[in-house]
Amino acid sequence: NKETKKSNSDSSKKKFTVGFDAEYPPYGYMDSDTGEYTGFDLELAQAVCDMEGWELVKTPIEWASKDAELNNGNIDCIWNGFTINGKEDKYEWSDPYVNNQQVVVVAKNSGITKLADLKDKYVAAQSASAALQLLQKGGDQEKLGKTFKEIQEFPDYNTAFSELEAGTVDAVAMDVGVAKYQVNNRNNNYVILDENLNSEQYGIGFKKGNTELRDKVNADLKKLYDEGKVDELAKKYGIEDMICLGDK
């Protein structure tokens, strides 16, 4: 079922293959009603494809394998809540389009109200995520991370939240948009700490050297922003206050 890459000269539609984490709402996830992959980033990618006459191929990836998928040519880009900061030189980036923060989620009745309360606690994060990198050696919050009892890595945030619900971890470090989605969909038994771990921005990451495709998608993104499509989708997914495309 592997998609074959088509060249531009192919008479059929050009395929635009987007790599994404399939458990990363509201950016990319499986809609349980339709059984289809959807989300803010995937709908935005579809809008670009509609402009270009391309066929969107949605390719779920293991987040820890994203670089291999990109470098092997299995995907054209990584488009899924992808943090630019600290990785500026590793990819050909689109303009930043979402302002993001890394935050910490805890159970409402945990007694944890600030970052300092995480001392000697078990904290979960996704493997190869921006949150994990922040808290590990060399990260901006390395000092905080060292106060934890342990940082536990999970392949996706649904698993991390299951551990939080079970009480095997005390907190989850994650992106604010995903955190809000999870908190709202879990009977509000959880809270996001007021103190952020950082502020950062999302971009679309293309393989180094692939400036042609990056430039094309970037131009389309600007057009979609000017036409109001980006804000329309952002409202649909509850992240309208996080869009930064118009900021200069």
Say what each PLM segment does.
Residues 65, 81-90, 134-137, 162-199:
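A ligand-binding cleft/hinge motif common to bilobed small-molecule-binding domains
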Residues 30-31, 45-54, 131-153, 183-187:
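Ligand-binding cleft/hinge of the Venus flytrap
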Residues 22, 99-106, 176-180, 184-222, ...:
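Periplasmic-binding protein-like
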Residues 42, 57-68, 151-163, 200:
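Short helix-initiation/N-cap motifs at beta->coil->alpha
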Residues 1-15, 244-248:
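Short, low-complexity disordered leader/linker segments with a strong preference
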Residues 42-51, 112, 116, 121-122, ...:
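Extended ligand-binding regions for polar small-molecule ligands
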Residues 15-38:
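Short glycine-rich His-centered loop
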